Amino acid sequence: MYLYIETLKQRLDAINQLRLERAFASMSDVFKQVYGLIPVLLHYHHPQLPGYIQGNVPHGTCFFEPDDVQRQWVNKLTNASCDEPMNGYTSGELPITGIYSMGSTSSIGQSHCSDIDIWVCHQSWLDQDERARLQRKCLLIEQWAGELGIDVTFFLIDENRFRHHASGSLGGEDCGSTQHILLLDEFYRTAVRLAGKRLLWTMVPVEEEYHYDEYVNSLYAQGVLTPNEWLDLGGLGELSAEEYFGASLWQLYKSVDSPYKAVLKSILLEAYSADYPNGKLLALEMKQHLHRGEIVNYGLDAYCMMLERVTRYLVSINDLTRLDLIRRCFYLKVCEKLSNEKNENEPAGWRRQVLSQLVTQWQWDHERLAILDNRDSWKIERVRNAHNELLDTMMQSYRNLIRFARRNNLSVSASPQDIGVLTRKLYAAFEALPGKVTLVNPQISPDLSEPHLTFIYVPPGRANRSGWYLYNRAPDFAHIVGHQPLEYNRYLNKLVAWSYFNGLLTKDSQVYIHQGDSSCDEIKLHELVRDISSHFPIRLPAPTPKALYSPCEIRHLAIIVNLEVDPTERFSDQVVHFDFRKLDVFSFGEEEQCLIGSIDLLYRNSWNEVRTLHFNGTQSMLESLKTILGKMHQDAAPPASVEVFCYSQHLRGLIRTRVQQLVSECIELRLSTNRLEPGRFKALRIAGQTWGLFFERLNVSVQKLENAIEFYGAISYNKLHGLPVKLGKDARYLPAVIDGFACEGIIQFFFETTEDNNVFNIYILDEANRVEIYSHCEGSKEELVKDVSRFYSSSHDRFTYGSSFINFNLPQFYQIVKVDGATQVLPFAGGSFGKLSDLGKTAPKEEMSTKPIQGFNDYQAVHHH
């Protein structure tokens, strides 16, 4: 046994040394410096070293001895000798037990732009303050590396973390509550030991994995291994189907921003789930090769092993389309441009040699290599094809995931809040809605700019659909005829926004227009482009998990007036009588004409979605106002900016100012915190008619007011909306705390427990914020959540991309609770968040009423419109 263990240690050290050499090979001098000094900076703590803070900061790594280069560097900076080892150096009792890099570092997937993920494994006896100081030290080292242009992220890992199934929070690379064993799987197969103890897990044969602790204890009992010499993070025991689900959802979350990087991992998890529960994790395959002395896959390269496993899976299900895609993703990740001939005198690196062998096996020709190598020059047509292909692949993985959940009758182990955040990000990125600007270039190509863009208007009655067409060509007959347009939309605002936010339209683009009988000419178009580019940055930081879990709010809003229809055009060739003292742009002159002919809305919300809406006609101001205000729940933050762009031929400044004043006043009324005035209203005269905007608790309604009696009657009626609604014998109010959560466009359920804990009330707000109230309900809230989720997932499929049908925006569930005497709304967190296995099942609509909760149908629903 002793000789067997010694042989394994030698193999393990040899593989680790190979990975270290590969991590340094072909990398920049700065990368080599940072990567090589990380162990030194964590081992020592000195005012002259990066990462120093005052106080008792845990430092020192078990069994670490700096090499000559590291020692010289430290001695030079500190003017002191670091030749003497620390106390406890050989006992394994220093605070840091091991320093490991993980991920693509040292693999064929490492490139000059790769970041470095470092696990700093520490003793479990560090207290909270000590961990906080060590975390601060790591943060300062990250900042030092960042100043040198190297992206390093440290993760503090308690050596008992995985034994206790502890999890981080969503948003970090440790994936929130959605991963545990799978995170350890990735670490074990990609880890490179920079300093500290060896990993005990590698010494345990695969066949003993399910008896991990017993086998380890037997090795200790025999004296073959000494406990303090090894880092023991635990075995890769039995995985739950819930963890597969959570991890796969997390990979889809990451694929929104980095599709080429994440799609390979997504399909690996799909391959795992296909073999569940009898499959073998990739780390176990690697360990089996190590124990057998089989140094396969180009030196047990973690990235090549992942590709090989995914290839086996896709071939087994005859999915050659996705197989071709993951090979291209792999090729692009490696970043070795094989179509560029190397100098004969320059030796080819190991990564280039491996990739050359692979593309030969795949039978790729030079033309395909040239296209992939030229990705930095891809333009919109190729990028959009790539985006749709990646999207179809992700949706295929999502559908397979739902089938897996249904097959295994899942209740998800991820917290409801994490699942809500994950699905919201997918919804924001992928759900196709009218007016939403689809962003087609998530890190596919760095530059989609076009030198020439032509917007052509086709009026009604022609062979082609009426509306606007966009071409990436100059506007001459030869360039346009016979070529497909890049994009079409009925309204110019949407088309300009699409070209701008996708990076086609830049300050260097030549923009042309063929306006037909539209009011928008070349001058207006250039003004619109200038206004949008001045007020809307293309890139913003990704939305935070908190923003994704909250109702979406308008952040930046532009109100575009008279772009396509301009009533003031007729003032150029006729006499118009009006009173300068009564310049009302909404009811102008003797004819009381509304000078607002069209309004386009362009806004970005807190989920980073970009939306456009179009209104035309006399009522466009009223309709757009109601729409804007309806998208603001009462507790929403005011938009960071509200801009009015006006393109009227005449009275432009007056119209812009009046619209700005009106919108600002209405937003203030909508978001005012004074809820003692449920009857707040705004009267507005448009084209000789008086309208009332009524600011109610949950929405804003509009009513035409023909005379004084109707006017004051409407105001009085509106105030009555604030009074309680009676159900049965008891008065049931809509709790005021709900107001801050009411959000149009989504179904919301609020559960309120009564003094009798066996019964509860339900308040349901539909997508238009109409209210249904059910009182004295009995039964299982969890079952209701499950049934409602299943109902909406099967009957509200609005997401359409090719053959994909996914609805991410499921109903949201909350509970109204008392905390320290104050009423609060919290995410519903019952025994489970519904069974995700039911998502995607086809259920008849009446299923919800065939198994009602007791009391759920005992009271008539009251609707507020």
UniProtKB/Swiss-Prot annotation:
UniProt keyword Transcription present: no
Catalytic: annotated span: 1-540
Domain of life where this protein originates: Bacteria
Any GO CC annotation of this UniProt entry: cytoplasm
Entry keywords, A to Z: ATP-binding, cAMP biosynthesis, Cytoplasm, Lyase, Nucleotide-binding
Ranges annotated as spanning the membrane: none
Region (Regulatory) residue spans: 546-865
GO molecular function, one term: adenylate cyclase activity
Matches recorded under Pfam families: Adenyl_cycl_N, Adenylate_cycl
SS bonds (residue pairs): none
PROSITE patterns noted in UniProt: ADENYLATE_CYCLASE_1_1 (PS01092), ADENYLATE_CYCLASE_1_2 (PS01093)
InterPro entries referenced in this protein's UniProt entry, alphabetically: Adenylate_cyclase_1, Adenylate_cyclase_1_CS, Adenylate_cyclase_1_N
Enzyme Commission code(s) on record: 4.6.1.1
Phosphoprotein found in the keyword field: no
Reactions catalysed according to its record: ATP = 3',5'-cyclic AMP + diphosphate
GO BP term (any one): cAMP biosynthetic process
Subcellular location: Cytoplasm
Family note: Belongs to the adenylyl cyclase class-1 family.
Protein name: Adenylate cyclase
Natural source organism: Proteus mirabilis
